[in-house]
């Protein structure tokens, strides 16, 4: 991962009296929220939402989240970000190994010790649909 360039090294360009500054901050993968995953994430309490956003930013920059586990039952390369807050445990399931995009498959509040089958099935279904769209 490349370090951000100092301001003097930034690319400057003028078009029609407008100055454009292009700053290379390194490789950052775009993110795509599948199904209702963005709405689900927005439904998290503020602290959990902020932490999940920070962890997703790490993934976009090619870093591992601080607390994660693989989810092979859903698919190859699928991971679960674990967020623990006073309001409870929250999860964001994503895959970052398809093309150059981070796909958020599902976001939810965890209420039992084991991830509920419906949450696993929903994430797996969204993954299958995305893989089919890419063919």
Question: Where are the regions that the model predicts?
Answer:
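ATP-dependent carboxylate-activation loops
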Residues: 105
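Short, surface-exposed charged micro-motifs
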Residues: 93
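Basic, Lys/Arg-enriched alpha-helical interface segments
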Residues: 2-89, 98-101, 109-135
């Amino acid at each position: 991962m490349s370090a951000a360039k100092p301001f003097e090294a930034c690319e400057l360009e003028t078009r029609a009296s407008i100055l454009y500054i292009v700053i290379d901050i390194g490789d950052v993968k775009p993110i795509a929220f599948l199904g209702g995953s963005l709405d689900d994430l927005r439904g998290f309490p503020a602290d959990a939402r902020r932490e999940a956003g920070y962890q997703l930013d790490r993934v976009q920059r090619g870093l591992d989240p601080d607390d994660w586990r693989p989810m092979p039952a859903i698919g190859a390369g699928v991971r679960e970000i674990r967020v623990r807050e006073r309001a409870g445990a929250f999860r964001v399931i994503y895959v970052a190994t398809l093309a150059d995009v981070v796909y958020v498959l599902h976001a939810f509040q965890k209420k039992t010790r084991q991830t509920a089958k419906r949450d696993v099935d929903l994430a797996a279904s969204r993954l299958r649909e995305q893989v089919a769209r890419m063919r």
